[in-house]
Design a protein with these regions (language model features):
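Bacterial N-terminal signal peptides
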Residues: 28-39
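Transmembrane beta-strand segments that form the barrel wall of outer-membrane beta-barrel proteins
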Residues: 45-49, 71-85, 106-119, 149-155, ...
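Solvent-exposed loop/turn segments connecting transmembrane beta-strands
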Residues: 48-57, 81-90, 120-122, 201-208, ...
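Membrane-embedded beta-strands of outer-membrane beta-barrel proteins
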Residues: 61, 95, 132-134, 174-176, ...
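Repeated loop/turn-to-beta-strand initiation elements of outer-membrane beta-barrel proteins
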Residues: 69-75, 104-109, 141-145, 184-188, ...
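Hydrophobic/aromatic-rich structural module bridging two neighboring secondary-structure elements via a short loop
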Residues: 87-140
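Outer-membrane beta-barrel "beta-signal"
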Residues: 131-137, 257-271
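Outer-membrane beta-barrel transmembrane domain signature
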Residues: 150-249, 270-271
Length: 271
């Protein structure tokens, strides 16, 4: 009511009275505006950051069935280790369908069942992940360049506080890749950079760049049907979560930063 009275007296008075009222009310509102601005700035700057460094490993096996020239299905099993290769991280079972829309454009749909290890004394958490991959490529000589867009949704089966994290986490991943085919060897070294951004993080945090991944690797054709892939990846991962006080207001933002060095090996077979 006080603000409404100030507004009415300020803009519905006339002449000199209006000027005096405007000056007086401005002096009253300035301290309030300054206090609100200071509080908002302090809230935005209240962020506590922790850092983690880890060496990790991934081992996988992929079985692909060609369905004609343009269609294929793949079953992939992957084991992930963390804490300097000393502890199980996750187990992925992924089923995918790929379709070559054009020689330069490929679309694929994926479902992954993820068994996530939550530490000693706790059961594995099962997660369901669905995503699409849309890949455009350009070839020139022995070089191949590609851009991949990947919208992804991960459903958590364990309880998730919606004020801290989304029960179904949506992200969008962008990957730019360069690959070179070494003539007469079956060897294809590659490098890529991938960015992951959140799409539905809690309002208290806001959407942000969640992960930056860079990778160097090589694919080697053992036979016409089998292949081996070896890679090194560096992940810089960010995880922002609100921490609440006793009054259920955001006390600060906990920001975990992880630097992960990953060695991976995959065997693939096509039939």
């Amino acid at each position: 009511m006080n603000l409404l009275r100030l507004f009415r007296h300020t803009f519905f008075s006339s002449g000199a009275a209006c000027k005096r009222t405007l000056a007086r009310n401005t002096r009253r509102l300035l301290p309030l505006a300054a206090a609100l601005l200071f509080a908002a700035t302090a809230q935005a700057q209240e962020r506590r950051t922790t850092h983690e460094n880890d060496f990790r490993a991934r081992f996988s096996f992929a079985l692909t069935k060609q369905l004609g020239q343009r269609h294929s299905i793949t079953l992939d099993e992957e084991l992930r280790l963390k804490d300097n290769w000393s502890q199980l991280d996750r187990i992925y079972t992924t089923l995918s369908y790929a379709y070559d829309v054009r020689p330069w454009f490929k679309a694929a749909a994926f479902y992954a069942l993820i068994a996530n290890d939550r530490g000693a004394g706790r059961s594995m958490e099962m997660r369901h992940r669905f995503y699409l991959e849309l890949t455009a490529s350009y070839k020139t000589g022995a070089w191949s360049f590609s851009l991949r867009e990947r919208p992804q949704a991960t459903l958590h089966t364990a309880h998730v506080d919606p004020a801290v994290a989304a029960e179904t986490a949506w992200v969008l991943r962008h990957r730019l890749m360069a690959e070179y085919a070494v003539a007469g060897t079956g060897l294809k070294p590659y490098a890529f950079v991938e960015l992951t951004q959140t799409l539905n993080a809690p309002e208290t945090v806001g959407n942000y760049l969640e992960k930056v991944r860079s990778s160097l690797g090589a694919k080697y054709a053992l036979t016409k049907r089998s292949s081996l892939e070896f890679y090194y990846r560096f992940d810089y991962k960010i995880s922002d979560e609100p921490v609440f006080d006793d009054f259920h207001s955001v006390d600060y933002i906990s920001s975990e930063r992880g630097s992960h060095h990953i060695i991976g090996l995959e065997y693939g077979y096509k039939f």
